[in-house]
Amino acid sequence: MNSYLNIKINGKNLEKKADIENAILKFDEDLKENPDDEATIVGKSVLLYKLGKLNESLNCLNQIENIRNVSIIELKAVILMGLENYKQALELLNEVLKVDNGNISALYYKTECLFQLKRFNEVVDTANVALKIDKNHQSILINKFCSLVELNSTKEALKVKEKLLRLGLNCNI
């Protein structure tokens, strides 16, 4: 997912729940001294996300006023997607894409949101834009394929499936 989700603290990848919880406590200590530090807020939010505490993660990010960093906006969208708030996530992803229309991860997440909202034609359109940037993006190709199936566009769906198979994706689709 987003680069924030692979955060490393003190050069150590945080995988164990206890390590993550200890890191959150350290972030809390830092936030007492500097409550507006975006990097600390984002770090804590990411770790809460990693623990599956999505509401807390979102509340943490909501402490940042006037978010301008598109990576943070995208992170917020990912959290909203985890909370199944696809409409609001889509709005944020569109904000990201206004700033950087070639942001492949935002385009991918947008196809995910649109699919969940059953806006299949828009999934295909967004996928086509994204595939001009990264023609072999498997997750986007899968979303395009599934949307074409939903739209009963069998011939076009089969072309996408063939491409996925050529890319070596072992799929039962």
Q: Model features per residue range: what roles?
A:
Residues 35, 67-69, 101, 135, ...:
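Short coil turns that delineate tetratricopeptide repeat
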